[in-house]
Amino acid sequence: MKLKSKLFVICLAAAAIFTAAGVSANAEALDFHVTERGMT
């Protein structure tokens, strides 16, 4: 059980890092789309 929860936390951290990397890589494009859509 402990190993599974640890693995889950690691997966969450990896996903967060991957998302942050993608956001920073496409920051300008994302910012433009968000502004265009009026943050809906």
Curated annotation (Swiss-Prot):
Further details from the record: CSF, PhrF and PhrK stimulate ComA-dependent gene expression to different levels and are all required for full expression of genes activated by ComA.
Gene symbol of the encoding locus: phrC
Lineage of the organism: Bacteria, Bacillati, Bacillota, Bacilli, Bacillales
UniProt name for this protein: Competence and sporulation stimulating factor
Inducing stimuli: Part of the rapC-phrC operon, which is controlled by the P1 promoter. Transcription from the P1 promoter is activated by high cell density through the phosphorylated form of ComA. PhrC is part of an autoregulatory loop, and it positively regulates its own expression. In addition, transcription of phrC is also regulated by a P2 promoter, which directs transcription of phrC only and is controlled by the sigma-H factor.
Assembly and interaction partners: Interacts with RapC and inhibits its interaction with ComA.
Residues with site note (Cleavage): 35-36
Single Gene Ontology BP annotation: quorum sensing
Secreted among keywords: yes
Post-translational modification, as annotated: Secreted with a propeptide domain, which is cleaved in the cell wall by the secreted serine proteases subtilisin, Epr and Vpr to produce a mature signaling peptide. Contains a predicted signal peptide cleavage site in the N-terminal region, however the propeptide is probably subject to only one processing event, at the N-terminal end of the mature peptide.
Known outcome of mutating residue 35 to A: Slightly increases transcription of the ComA-controlled gene rapA. No change in CSF levels
Gene disruption: observed consequences: Null mutant produces no detectable CSF activity, but null mutation has modest effects on competence gene expression. Deletion of the gene results in decreased expression of genes activated by ComA, and significantly changes the expression of 66 operons. In non-domesticated strains, the mutant is blocked early in swarming, forming stunted dendrites, with abnormal dendrite initiation morphology. Mutant exhibits a specific migration defect that cannot be trans-complemented by CSF in a mixed swarm.
Positions annotated as propeptide: 1-35
Any one GO CC term of the record: extracellular region
Organism whose genome encodes this protein: Bacillus subtilis (strain 168)
Effect of residue 34 to E: 50% decrease in CSF production. 97% reduction in cleavage of pro-CSF by subtilisin and 42% reduction in cleavage by Vpr
Signal peptide: none
Family: Belongs to the Phr family.
Function statement: Signaling molecule that serves as a cell density signal for both genetic competence development and sporulation. Secreted during production, but the mature peptide acts intracellularly, indicating that it needs to be imported into the cell to function. At low concentrations, CSF stimulates expression of the genes controlled by ComA, a transcriptional factor that regulates the development of genetic competence. It includes the srfA operon, which encodes a small protein, ComS, required for competence development, and the surfactin biosynthetic enzymes.
Effect of residue 36 to A: Does not stimulate expression of the srfA operon. No change in inhibitory activity. Strong decrease in sporulation stimulation. Loss of activity toward RapB. Does not acquire any ability to inhibit RapA
Keywords: Competence, Cytoplasm, Quorum sensing, Secreted, Sporulation
Chief subcellular location: secreted
Result when mutating residue 35 to P: Decreases transcription of the ComA-controlled gene rapA
Effect of residue 31 to A: 40% decrease in CSF production
Reported impact of residue 35 to K: 35% decrease in CSF production
Phenotype for residue 39 to A: Does not stimulate expression of the srfA operon. Loss of inhibitory activity. Strong decrease in sporulation stimulation
Subcellular location(s) per record: Secreted; Cytoplasm; Host cell
